[in-house]
């Protein structure tokens, strides 16, 4: 059995960690990509290097699409008329291609970290 004073201390520690976590995420810069007519807009997205970013992918099409990148090690299906959040980085300076696997002929783009 855990003494009540230890339980209170653990509860305070867990609560403090939970309250501190959202502020760390809020400090990350956010960028938006829109999927429209099976294309990513913008096709090229410039982001800061060495910084973790929040990427908001909005699918304006009625059909699902995927945000996928081998170089970023990310794969996320976004249902039609919805959005998803993908966290990326920190990235070394460079170019990172991404694509939509369901419409590979048109859904292409790249992230440039500078």
What are these regions (language model features)?
Residues 2-11:
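Bacterial N-terminal signal peptides that target proteins for export
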Residues 11-15, 19:
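Hydrophobic helical h-region of N-terminal Sec-dependent signal peptides
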Residues 21-23:
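N-terminal signal peptide c-region/cleavage motif recognized by signal peptidases
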Residues 27-50:
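N-terminal edge beta-strand
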Residues 27-32, 79-114:
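Extracellular/periplasmic metallocenter environments
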Residues 43-45, 73-77, 87:
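Beta-strand-rich interaction surfaces with strong enrichment in secreted/lumenal proteins
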Residues 53, 63-65, 107:
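Short beta-strand/loop motifs in extracellular/secreted proteins, especially
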Residues 57-59:
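Asparagine-centered strand-capping/turn motif at beta-strand->loop junctions
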